[in-house]
Protein backbone atom coordinates (compact mmCIF):
# COMPACT_ATOMS: atom_id res chain seq x y z
CA UNK A 1 0.00 0.00 0.00
CA UNK A 2 2.74 2.44 0.87
CA UNK A 3 4.34 2.20 -2.57
CA UNK A 4 1.02 3.03 -4.26
CA UNK A 5 0.85 6.30 -2.31
CA UNK A 6 4.25 7.33 -3.69
CA UNK A 7 3.13 6.56 -7.23
CA UNK A 8 -0.03 8.60 -6.82
CA UNK A 9 1.93 11.71 -5.85
CA UNK A 10 4.33 11.84 -8.79
CA UNK A 11 3.39 9.20 -11.27
CA UNK A 12 4.64 5.72 -11.89
CA UNK A 13 8.21 5.10 -10.81
CA UNK A 14 8.83 8.58 -9.43
CA UNK A 15 9.82 9.19 -5.85
CA UNK A 16 9.02 12.34 -3.96
CA UNK A 17 10.19 14.98 -4.50
CA UNK A 18 10.32 14.83 -8.28
CA UNK A 19 13.71 15.66 -9.72
CA UNK A 20 13.93 19.38 -10.43
CA UNK A 21 10.63 20.20 -8.72
CA UNK A 22 12.21 22.63 -6.27
CA UNK A 23 14.13 24.38 -9.06
CA UNK A 24 11.01 24.86 -11.20
CA UNK A 25 9.12 26.11 -8.19
CA UNK A 26 11.87 28.60 -7.34
CA UNK A 27 11.95 29.93 -10.90
CA UNK A 28 8.20 30.53 -10.89
CA UNK A 29 8.46 32.36 -7.59
CA UNK A 30 11.36 34.48 -8.89
CA UNK A 31 9.43 35.33 -12.06
CA UNK A 32 6.40 36.29 -9.98
CA UNK A 33 8.57 38.52 -7.79
CA UNK A 34 10.08 40.24 -10.82
CA UNK A 35 6.66 40.85 -12.39
CA UNK A 36 5.41 42.31 -9.13
CA UNK A 37 8.41 44.66 -8.98
CA UNK A 38 7.88 46.22 -12.42
CA UNK A 39 4.94 48.52 -11.56
CA UNK A 40 6.78 49.74 -8.44
CA UNK A 41 9.92 50.49 -10.41
CA UNK A 42 7.99 52.34 -13.08
CA UNK A 43 5.99 54.32 -10.54
CA UNK A 44 9.00 55.38 -8.48
CA UNK A 45 11.58 55.98 -11.20
CA UNK A 46 9.56 56.80 -14.29
CA UNK A 47 9.00 54.67 -17.34
CA UNK A 48 11.88 54.40 -19.78
CA UNK A 49 11.66 53.00 -23.25
CA UNK A 50 14.17 52.13 -25.89
CA UNK A 51 13.86 54.46 -28.84
CA UNK A 52 14.23 52.84 -32.23
CA UNK A 53 14.68 53.85 -35.85
CA UNK A 54 12.31 56.50 -37.16
CA UNK A 55 11.93 58.68 -40.25
CA UNK A 56 13.04 61.88 -38.51
CA UNK A 57 16.17 60.69 -36.69
CA UNK A 58 17.30 57.77 -38.86
CA UNK A 59 18.37 54.20 -38.18
CA UNK A 60 19.07 53.33 -34.52
CA UNK A 61 22.41 51.51 -34.22
CA UNK A 62 22.59 51.60 -30.43
CA UNK A 63 19.99 52.00 -27.72
CA UNK A 64 19.94 51.46 -23.96
CA UNK A 65 18.19 52.49 -20.75
CA UNK A 66 19.45 53.15 -17.25
CA UNK A 67 18.03 54.01 -13.86
CA UNK A 68 16.88 57.48 -14.93
CA UNK A 69 17.74 57.83 -18.62
CA UNK A 70 17.35 56.43 -22.11
CA UNK A 71 20.04 56.77 -24.79
CA UNK A 72 19.92 56.12 -28.56
CA UNK A 73 22.51 56.51 -31.32
CA UNK A 74 21.02 57.22 -34.75
CA UNK A 75 22.65 56.91 -38.16
CA UNK A 76 21.18 59.89 -40.04
CA UNK A 77 19.71 59.48 -43.52
CA UNK A 78 22.56 61.53 -45.01
CA UNK A 79 25.20 59.37 -43.26
CA UNK A 80 28.59 59.25 -44.99
CA UNK A 81 30.84 56.31 -43.95
CA UNK A 82 33.88 58.41 -44.88
CA UNK A 83 32.75 61.02 -42.33
CA UNK A 84 30.95 59.00 -39.62
CA UNK A 85 28.80 61.49 -37.69
CA UNK A 86 25.89 60.17 -35.62
CA UNK A 87 22.95 61.83 -33.89
CA UNK A 88 22.71 60.87 -30.22
CA UNK A 89 19.63 61.57 -28.12
CA UNK A 90 19.45 61.25 -24.34
CA UNK A 91 16.14 61.33 -22.44
CA UNK A 92 16.09 62.05 -18.71
CA UNK A 93 13.44 60.91 -16.22
CA UNK A 94 11.43 64.08 -16.85
CA UNK A 95 11.27 63.38 -20.58
CA UNK A 96 13.71 66.18 -21.45
CA UNK A 97 15.85 65.41 -24.49
CA UNK A 98 19.50 66.30 -25.01
CA UNK A 99 20.65 65.92 -28.61
CA UNK A 100 24.22 65.84 -29.84
CA UNK A 101 26.04 65.11 -33.09
CA UNK A 102 29.08 62.87 -32.52
CA UNK A 103 31.90 62.61 -35.04
CA UNK A 104 33.26 59.22 -33.99
CA UNK A 105 36.57 59.84 -35.78
CA UNK A 106 37.28 62.50 -33.12
CA UNK A 107 36.30 60.56 -29.99
CA UNK A 108 39.17 60.44 -27.48
CA UNK A 109 39.01 57.02 -25.81
CA UNK A 110 41.26 58.20 -22.97
CA UNK A 111 39.11 61.26 -22.19
CA UNK A 112 35.48 61.34 -23.26
CA UNK A 113 32.04 60.97 -21.76
CA UNK A 114 29.77 57.92 -21.85
CA UNK A 115 27.65 59.36 -24.67
CA UNK A 116 30.55 59.79 -27.10
CA UNK A 117 32.02 56.38 -26.24
CA UNK A 118 28.64 54.68 -26.61
CA UNK A 119 28.29 56.29 -30.06
CA UNK A 120 31.82 55.20 -30.98
CA UNK A 121 31.38 51.61 -29.76
CA UNK A 122 27.98 51.42 -31.51
CA UNK A 123 29.64 52.59 -34.74
CA UNK A 124 32.40 49.97 -34.43
CA UNK A 125 29.84 47.20 -33.92
CA UNK A 126 27.42 48.37 -36.64
CA UNK A 127 30.19 48.88 -39.20
CA UNK A 128 31.72 45.46 -38.46
CA UNK A 129 35.10 47.00 -37.61
CA UNK A 130 34.90 45.55 -34.09
CA UNK A 131 31.65 43.57 -33.74
CA UNK A 132 31.85 43.12 -29.96
CA UNK A 133 32.73 46.75 -29.17
CA UNK A 134 29.29 47.94 -28.06
CA UNK A 135 28.70 44.94 -25.81
CA UNK A 136 32.18 45.18 -24.26
CA UNK A 137 31.75 48.91 -23.65
CA UNK A 138 28.35 48.53 -21.98
CA UNK A 139 29.62 45.69 -19.77
CA UNK A 140 32.76 47.65 -18.82
CA UNK A 141 30.56 50.55 -17.73
CA UNK A 142 28.34 48.19 -15.75
CA UNK A 143 31.47 46.75 -14.12
CA UNK A 144 32.27 50.24 -12.88
CA UNK A 145 28.79 51.39 -11.79
CA UNK A 146 26.90 48.13 -11.26
CA UNK A 147 24.20 46.78 -13.55
CA UNK A 148 21.79 49.70 -13.17
CA UNK A 149 23.47 52.27 -10.94
CA UNK A 150 24.57 54.63 -13.72
CA UNK A 151 22.55 57.85 -13.63
CA UNK A 152 21.74 60.51 -16.20
CA UNK A 153 24.44 62.76 -14.70
CA UNK A 154 27.05 59.99 -15.01
CA UNK A 155 26.62 60.05 -18.80
CA UNK A 156 28.28 63.46 -19.03
CA UNK A 157 31.36 62.83 -16.85
CA UNK A 158 34.71 62.53 -18.60
CA UNK A 159 36.47 59.17 -18.21
CA UNK A 160 39.57 57.37 -19.35
CA UNK A 161 37.77 54.47 -21.04
CA UNK A 162 41.02 52.61 -21.70
CA UNK A 163 41.51 52.36 -17.92
CA UNK A 164 37.86 51.33 -17.44
CA UNK A 165 38.32 48.53 -20.00
CA UNK A 166 41.56 47.39 -18.37
CA UNK A 167 39.84 47.27 -14.97
CA UNK A 168 36.99 45.21 -16.45
CA UNK A 169 39.51 42.84 -18.07
CA UNK A 170 41.32 42.41 -14.77
CA UNK A 171 38.04 41.66 -12.99
CA UNK A 172 37.28 38.91 -15.52
CA UNK A 173 40.81 37.53 -15.26
CA UNK A 174 40.66 37.46 -11.45
CA UNK A 175 37.30 35.66 -11.63
CA UNK A 176 38.75 33.05 -13.99
CA UNK A 177 36.38 34.07 -16.80
CA UNK A 178 38.61 33.69 -19.85
CA UNK A 179 35.81 34.39 -22.35
CA UNK A 180 34.89 37.67 -20.63
CA UNK A 181 38.55 38.63 -20.47
CA UNK A 182 39.05 37.93 -24.18
CA UNK A 183 35.88 39.86 -25.15
CA UNK A 184 37.28 42.99 -23.47
CA UNK A 185 40.77 42.29 -24.83
CA UNK A 186 39.48 42.21 -28.41
CA UNK A 187 37.96 45.69 -27.99
CA UNK A 188 41.03 47.04 -26.16
CA UNK A 189 43.39 45.63 -28.80
CA UNK A 190 41.31 47.31 -31.51
CA UNK A 191 41.53 50.65 -29.69
CA UNK A 192 45.29 50.26 -29.16
CA UNK A 193 45.81 49.63 -32.89
CA UNK A 194 43.70 52.47 -34.26
Each language-model region and where it sits:
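Type III/flagellar secretion export determinants
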Residues: 1-194
